[in-house]
């Protein structure tokens, strides 16, 4: 039924599809269909952060049990957004810095860092990838972090502890998390050398 679509779609885009309940829900759908619909919906939402009318249209259409492919103009927005993401990814390829287990890079784009970080994870071949952007009005770094299956630590817990130590805030899931820390603390965040360090598995 349609009511069982949104939960597994959300689980896929939030990296929770391996959890017991989510895994059971995901298994009820053709995986390719679910991935296409979930990703397209995520891109529609991400590309429309400053378009409240279209965001409300998404809500209205979903409330009428329409699938993302039925949202008029939605797939076109998702396609344009995908092109924008890929353009940013190509622009930073040569700037990625690599440590023992961690790859990281700064972006200067209107795109949220969370839209780019998985590309860095794949391109670097490292267990953990980090993408950040600076926000001058609050003198902070906005950080997104992802881990591959090779990552053997709980990133959300590490980032929560580390960012709190550095007068920031953060946390999240085992393989996907984020943080906001003072800009002057970023180097310390990267190089922290103890059991909470991202680059010392």
Residue ranges and their predicted role:
Residues 1-100, 106-107, 111, 120-124, ...:
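A structured phosphate/pyrophosphate-recognition subdomain
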Residues 101-201:
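Glycine-rich, acidic loop segments that terminate in or are immediately followed by a histidine
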């Amino acid at each position: 039924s349609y009511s069982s679509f949104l939960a597994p779609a959300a689980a896929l885009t939030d990296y929770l599809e391996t959890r017991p309940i989510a895994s059971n829900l995901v298994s009820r759908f053709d995986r390719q269909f679910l991935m296409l619909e979930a990703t397209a919906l995520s891109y529609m939402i991400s590309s429309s952060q400053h378009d409240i009318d279209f965001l409300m249209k998404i809500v209205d259409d979903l409330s009428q049990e329409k699938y993302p492919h039925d949202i008029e103009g939605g797939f076109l927005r998702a396609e344009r957004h995908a092109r924008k993401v890929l353009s940013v990814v190509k622009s930073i390829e040569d700037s990625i810095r690599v440590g023992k287990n961690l790859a990281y890079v700064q972006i200067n784009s209107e795109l949220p860092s969370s839209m780019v970080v998985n590309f860095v994870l794949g391109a670097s071949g490292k267990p953990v990838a980090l993408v950040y952007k600076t926000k001058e009005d609050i003198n902070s770094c906005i950080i997104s972090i992802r881990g591959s299956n090779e990552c053997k630590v709980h990133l959300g817990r590490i980032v929560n502890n580390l960012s709190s130590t550095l007068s920031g805030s953060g946390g999240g899931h085992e393989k996907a998390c984020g943080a906001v820390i003072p800009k002057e603390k970023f180097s310390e965040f990267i190089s922290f050398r103890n059991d909470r360090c991202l680059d010392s598995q």
